[in-house]
Amino acid sequence: MKFRRSGRLVDLTNYLLTHPHELIPLTFFSERYESAKSSISEDLTIIKQTFEQQGIGTLLTVPGAAGGVKYIPKMKQAEAEEFVQTLGQSLANPERILPGGYVYLTDILGKPSVLSKVGKLFASVFAEREIDVVMTVATKGIPLAYAAASYLNVPVVIVRKDNKVTEGSTVSINYVSGSSNRIQTMSLAKRSMKTGSNVLIIDDFMKAGGTINGMINLLDEFNANVAGIGVLVEAEGVDERLVDEYMSLLTLSTINMKEKSIEIQNGNFLRFFKDNLLKNGETES
């Protein structure tokens, strides 16, 4: 179908936004809009400039016969800081205190607007790690994993603590829960991922990191690689952390059960933003 340029720009933008991290040949757009590649290239230049100015992301152009254009979702550091600050204020409500030093997160994990921003933030930080799969453990981490995977355009695999007949043969391991020191079991369907996959692990809450450490050990059974670890909230003051390299959005500093108070601080996500800026030779925005 032949488009006017204004209509072509709208449709082209929408297509890119709904196909993140997908390399699309210019020939595809040229045939789709019945327009010359030179015209498509001009359109993409306009879209790239707008995406970068508005903090939507960027367009990566790959030259050559097998090349094309790829939309990479990005979140500006200033936007990430503002979002995490607002989220932290919401979680600092004393009514969220649960027995055992936990915080009620279910309502947060049910808000599409929050999940979308968390997913984009994770995807932005780990965009250059060539992620093949996002992994999480049932059940609270599932919405976060799908949110990140939607921006990375990769599948989600869910580790379970009980076997399900519908998943076929599984690989199971025993792991030690870091917070309770209890031996537990987790399993993953054998056909859930390819050997050698680069995996982004996502979870909602981390104390000592026993569950995440268990997922890392489970990945060894698939000869898969840990490409990154992202958690929504980590607990501070843990005697022994079983996971070293991870990104957290928020840190649960203290919970005073007697006085019904919570102290929430920013996690370490800013370090990852700054590392990416240094790696790419960019400046803060």
Curated annotation (Swiss-Prot):
Q: Any known activators or inhibitors?
A: The binding of PurR to DNA, and therefore the repressor activity, is influenced by interaction with the effector molecules 5-phosphoribosyl 1-pyrophosphate (PRPP) and (p)ppGpp. PRPP binds to PurR and reduces affinity of PurR for DNA, which inhibits the repressor activity and induces transcription of the target genes. On the contrary, (p)ppGpp enhances binding of PurR to DNA and repression of the transcription. PRPP and (p)ppGpp compete for PurR binding and allosteric control of transcription.
| The keyword Transcription regulation is assigned to this record | yes
Q: What is the effect of changing Y102A?
A: Decreases interaction with ppGpp
Q: Any idea which positions bind 5-phospho-alpha-D-ribose 1-diphosphate?
A: A138, T139, K140, R160, D203, D204, F205, K207, A208, T211
Q: Which domain of life is it from?
A: Bacteria
Q: Which GO terms describe its molecular function?
A: DNA binding
* Gene Ontology process terms (BP): negative regulation of DNA-templated transcription; negative regulation of purine nucleobase metabolic process
Q: What induces it?
A: Autoregulated.
Annotated region (Effector binding domain) at 74-285
Chain intervals for the UniProt region annotation (DNA binding domain) = 1-73
Residue positions annotated to bind guanosine 3',5'-bis(diphosphate) are Y102, G178, S179, K207, G209, G210, T211
| Entry's family note | Belongs to the purine/pyrimidine phosphoribosyltransferase family. PurR subfamily.
Quaternary context: Homodimer.
Question: What does the UniProt function comment say about this protein?
Answer: DNA-binding transcriptional repressor that controls the expression of a number of genes involved in the synthesis, metabolism and transport of purines. In response to a signal of excess adenine, represses the transcription of the pur operon, which encodes enzymes of the purine biosynthetic pathway. It also represses the expression of the purA and purR genes. In addition, controls the expression of several other genes or operons, which encode enzymes or transporters playing a role in purine nucleotide metabolism.
Q: What is this protein called?
A: Purine biosynthesis transcriptional repressor PurR
Instruction: Please tell me the species this chain comes from.
Output: Bacillus subtilis (strain 168)
The root-end lineage is:
Bacteria, Bacillati, Bacillota, Bacilli, Bacillales
Gene symbol?
Answer: purR
